[in-house]
A protein has these predicted regions:
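Aromatic- and acidic-residue-enriched carbohydrate-binding clefts of CAZyme catalytic domains
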Residues: 1-10, 42-95
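The substrate-binding groove and active-site-proximal loops of carbohydrate-active enzymes
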Residues: 1-5, 87-103, 126-137, 193-194
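Aromatic- and glycine-enriched glycan-recognition loops and surfaces
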Residues: 1-21, 100-105, 137-147, 156
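Active-site-proximal helices and loops of the catalytic beta/alpha 8
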Residues: 16, 29-30, 35-72, 109, ...
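Active-site-adjacent bridging/hinge elements
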Residues: 80-84, 117-119, 209
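Short, acidic/polar
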Residues: 99-116
Length: 209
């Protein structure tokens, strides 16, 4: 089978016939460094039909999709001073605050896949609390995201990845639920292994407790 939107539509239809639901993953905090918007790996630089990436030229239409800390003309081509998620240069952080176009594009994606003909049943949101450069913008964005999704499909689930206390996002106007590693995975790991996450040290007081 060759991957295509048509095949995906068929997959969702068959799942729904069987009483199953499908949630897709949304990574909206960052993209890959190979993404055509940045093109750090120069995959699209010489390919036909693509705009120049923001890593390659300051004149890229995607320039404001990323926050560059060095902006002199002589920093290009190859400006690696962009924000990366947790400093990872292979995961360039998206710069919504400086690009209304980017925000509108992503909100369009949010709406598209839960609408006909795709009819997906919800979103799982990667590192959702990290999106944006401020807590204020983060909440503003997810309220817009929820509005876009629920207007298109009121039954669609919005499930976000979160570490810690997610209560501020669960007030009925942003996310529906969370994958909470600190509140679930961590204690289950203690109970089953007697070890903390990312640790090789066994502790009797954790096992079975």
């Amino acid at each position: 089978l060759e991957a295509s939107n048509r095949l995906f539509i068929k997959l969702v239809e068959e799942l729904h016939k069987r009483g199953m639901r499908i949630i897709i993953d949304g990574v909206f905090n960052h993209c890959g460094s190979f993404n055509k918007w940045l093109d750090r790996e120069l995959i699209y630089e010489s390919a036909d039909g693509y705009e120049v990436g923001a890593f390659v030229s300051p004149k890229s239409p995607y320039r404001n999709y990323f926050l560059f800390h060095r902006t002199g003309e002589n920093e290009w081509p190859g400006n690696g001073s962009y924000d990366g998620w947790w400093g990872h240069d292979t995961l360039p952080k998206l710069n919504y605050e400086d690009s209304k176009e980017l925000e509108e594009y992503v909100l369009g994606i949010a709406k598209k896949w839960v609408s006909p003909p795709y009819n997906v049943d919800g979103w799982r949101l990667d590192v959702a609390a990290d999106l944006g450069r401020s807590n204020e913008y983060n909440h503003e964005f997810w309220k817009k995201f929820r509005k876009a999704v629920k207007e298109a499909n009121p039954h669609a689930l919005i499930l976000a990845e979160h570490y810690g206390d997610p209560s501020d996002w669960l007030q009925g106007d942003e996310w529906d639920s969370v994958m909470n590693y600190d509140a679930f995975m961590e204690p289950v790991t203690w109970f089953l292994t007697g070890m903390e996450k990312h640790s090789y040290e066994y502790r009797d007081d954790l096992l079975g407790n």
